[in-house]
A protein has these predicted regions:
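Terminal (often C-terminal
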Residues: 1-66, 72-76, 125-148
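Positively charged, low-complexity intrinsically disordered regions
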Residues: 4-6, 72, 88, 94, ...
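Generic detector of N-terminal low-structure segments
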Residues: 12, 83, 106-108, 120, ...
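N-terminal start-of-chain detector that recognizes signal peptides
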Residues: 24-25, 87-90, 112-117
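A short linear-motif detector with a strong N-terminal bias
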Residues: 31-32, 48, 82-85, 94-96, ...
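Glycine-rich strand-loop-strand elements at beta-sheet edges
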Residues: 37, 78-110
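A short, structured loop/turn motif at beta-sheet edges
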Residues: 47-48, 73-80, 107-115
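Extracellular beta-strand-rich recognition modules
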Residues: 49-59, 99-103, 113-121
């Protein structure tokens, strides 16, 4: 099990989110087993198995009716990513803080080809996705449930 987070805010799109990822390092953080690895927003699994992936995002919008799409994207060939789980999210009032969640259970049969990444697609302008370097705001959790 491991958690990764975005360390800085970004505006509008992160399609996909390619930068500012870090392994959680807050005091008391615990992981179990080997950690995921990340390069340019693409996550590699440490071993084959069935994994629960959860993506939690934190947002504000400067205008009313901010609309976002968040996704877990996966690939089984190492190249072509597609949406495995998505959530359409509305922000109904300017400056409201919102948290959204999507998740997916991924059968990783080959660690060289089975990978994932995360998307925040802003349909409306003036939305901010929040990150932080010392606590989890926008973050991903990976839990190995068992063998494939």
């Amino acid at each position: 099990m491991s958690q990764w987070r975005i360390t800085a805010d970004f505006s509008d799109d992160g399609n996909p989110i390619t930068s500012n990822w870090e392994l959680a390092d807050t005091d008391g953080y615990g992981s179990l087993g080997s950690n995921m690895t990340e390069s340019s927003g693409v996550f590699t699994f440490p071993a084959t198995g069935i994994y629960f992936i959860q993506f939690i995002t934190s947002h504000t919008a400067d205008n009313i009716d901010g609309l976002l799409q968040i996704q877990v994207e996966t690939t089984t060939n190492g190249t072509n990513f597609g949406g495995a789980s998505e959530q359409m999210c509305g922000i109904s009032r300017a400056s409201d803080a919102n948290t959204f969640v999507t998740s997916f259970v991924f059968d990783v049969t080959n660690v060289s080809t089975h990978k994932c990444r995360f998307v925040v697609a802003s349909v409306s302008s003036d939305t901010t996705t929040h990150g932080h370097s010392s606590q989890n705001e926008t973050h991903a959790t990976f839990i190995k449930l068992g063998d494939t």
